[in-house]
A protein has these predicted regions:
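C-terminal substrate-binding subdomain of Rossmann-fold SDR/epimerase-dehydratase oxidoreductases
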Residues: 16-20, 25, 31, 60-63, ...
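Active-site helix-initiating loop/hinge in glycosyltransferases
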Residues: 226, 230, 259-262
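A glycine/serine/threonine-rich, flexible loop-to-helix segment
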Residues: 49, 151-153, 231-239
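Amphipathic alpha-helical recognition patches that constitute DNA-binding helices
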Residues: 8, 12, 135, 192, ...
Length: 400
């Protein structure tokens, strides 16, 4: 039985990964969840999973050396998958120290505890030997690469290599807003305290591989969307505000471009890297879904308005009239400091080496996401506490 220590699994991507692994492997795996349950982590997200006999939940900080050492000694996980991180750019601007402590020092503590537990001696050449079948996977972001140019005002056809065409199985109508893309060899150039902290975590992970020979991988993903996304992020924030009849805040003119990846596709990629990724390698995970922020907002407005008209049972969720759900709700607010113009991942490496591709087109994934939020308002209410309301006012009220 393979054992996974998954940190930050009460958060968005970590929770979806745990759900994916349990669905795929059922009782053939054991999962230990370590989560400090900060603002973006909520036990309701994994309430069904932690009731299973093969799942153990532990509340705690990844920076707690004694706790992490004890967990690894007790459970002897084959894989450590580190999702635990402070992960919102706006919050990093107001409190950068917290991001450095959690994202860099917390990651280093996990690495050190794993290194001590998995070390088995040295080979004839003096190289460290670690327990067979063990691996540390650092979950990172495309934001470590900085910003790309937006070369086109409107989307243009995205051309992919013949190798990738053989993998993506019929995904067509791919588009792009630029001529350059992040690859695994793109120089790291973070532009916010959040991305700088994630860069530091990546570098210390790579250093543990180069210095100590630790078995590691790093994955860097584009923007995720899907169920259980905390409502400070763009898509769930827009959904929530539409239902509440609030304005829809959009930074600048909404021209910034992101590559959107459905979270279940991301979970599948992580699983493939864990089992088949070459030790020491970095893998970019992208969605082939470049969209401008303003177009995301308009799409969400259009879908919710259609659902409300065609399926009136959902109108009970509204605090406004159906006819008020329109683009007039959009409010352009002062742009974020250092707002990166465009992110775009080139996932050729993981496609060619591991056979992974993002199966979910944005047109399908966004409707699934919206319907999940409409059907799970109890979860939304459970995570939007008074602290969330104070944060929302701080971020958007004075920027209009």
């Amino acid at each position: 039985m393979k054992k996974y220590l998954v940190t930050g699994a009460a958060g968005f991507i970590g929770a979806n990964f745990v759900k994916y692994i349990l669905k795929k492997w059922n009782n053939e795996v054991e999962i230990i969840i370590l989560d400090d349950l900060t603002y973006a982590g909520n036990l309701m997200t994994i309430k069904d999973e932690i009731e299973q006999d093969n799942v153990t939940f532990i509340k705690g900080d990844i920076g707690n050396r004694e706790l992490v050492t004890d967990i690894i000694a007790t459970h002897n996980p084959h894989y450590i998958v580190n999702f635990a991180a402070e992960s919102h750019v706006d919050r990093s601007i107001t409190n950068p120290r917290l991001f450095l402590e959690t994202n860099i020092l917390g990651t280093q503590n996990l690495l050190d505890c794993a290194r001590n537990a998995w070390f088995e001696g040295k080979d004839a050449n003096g190289k460290n030997i670690y327990k067979e079948g063990h691996k540390f996977l650092q979950i990172s972001t495309d934001e470590v690469y900085g910003s790309l140019a937006k070369d086109f005002d409107s989307a243009q056809p995205l051309l992919v290599t013949d190798d990738v065409k053989q993998v993506i199985e019929g995904r067509d109508n791919l588009k792009t807003f630029g001529t350059q893309f992040f690859t695994e060899s793109t120089p790291l150039a973070p532009r916010s305290p959040y991305s700088a902290a994630k860069t530091g975590a990546d570098l210390i992970t790579l250093a543990y591989h180069e210095t100590y020979g630790m078995p590691i991988n790093i994955t860097r993903c584009s923007n995720n969307y899907g169920p259980y996304h905390f409502p400070e992020k763009l898509i769930p924030l827009i959904i929530k505000n539409i239902l509440e009849g609030k304005n829809l805040p959009v930074y600048g003119q909404g021209e910034n471009v992101r590559d959107w990846l459905y979270v279940e596709d991301h979970a599948k990629a992580i699983d493939m890297v864990l089992h088949n990724g070459k030790v020491g390698e970095v893998y970019n995970i992208g969605g082939f879904n470049e969209e401008q922020n303003i177009d995301i907002v308009k799409t969400v407005i259009s879908i919710i308005a259609r659902i409300m008209r065609e399926e009136p049972q959902y109108q009970a969720l509204l605090t406004c009239k159906v006819e008020d759900i329109n683009e007039g709700l959009i409010t352009f607010v002062t742009d974020r400091p250092g707002h990166d113009m465009r992110y775009a991942i080139d996932p050729t490496k993981i496609a060619v080496e591991l056979g992974w591709y993002p199966e979910t087109p944005f047109s399908i994934g966004i409707e699934k996401t919206i319907r999940w939020y409409l059907d799970n308002q109890e979860w939304v209410k459970s995570v939007t506490s008074g602290d969330y309301q104070k944060y929302y006012e701080q971020m958007y009220h004075n920027r209009q």
